Amino acid sequence: MKQLNSEQLQNIIGGNRWTNAYSAALGCAVPGVKYGKKLGGVWGAVIGGVGGAAVCGLAGYVRKG
């Protein structure tokens, strides 16, 4: 089995702690619901909340640093 060296480990994207993704998702879901409700009623709120959580949750997962 081949082992990774430290330079190869720097190229891995993602893998941050789950709390980073979770807090980022919650931080974007709330404004997504708020603005989505204004634009599209109940379904706008659902789409805005889920979309905001997905985008920011992914960003929190893959963010380096």
Swiss-Prot record:
GO biological process terms held by the UniProt record: defense response to bacterium; killing of cells of another organism
Main location: secreted
Membrane topology field: Single-pass membrane protein
GO cellular component, one term: membrane
Pfam families: Bacteriocin_IIc
Top-rank taxon, per record: Bacteria
Compartment list: Secreted; Host cell membrane
Entry's transmembrane regions: 39-59
Record's keyword terms, sorted: Antibiotic, Antimicrobial, Bacteriocin, Host cell membrane, Host membrane, Membrane, Secreted, Transmembrane, Transmembrane helix
Propeptide cleavage-removed residue intervals: 1-15
Keyword field contains Membrane: yes
Subunit structure, as described in the record: Active lactobin is composed of two different peptides, one which is lactobin A.
Function in brief: This heat stable bacteriocin inhibits the growth of closely related Lactobacillus species. It may act as a pore-forming protein, creating a channel in the cell membrane. It kills Lactobacillus helveticus ATCC 15009, but displays no activity towards Listeria species.
NCBIfam families: bacteriocin_sig
Family, per entry: Belongs to the bacteriocin class IIB family.
Name under which the protein is recorded: Bacteriocin amylovorin-L
Provenance organism: Lactobacillus amylovorus
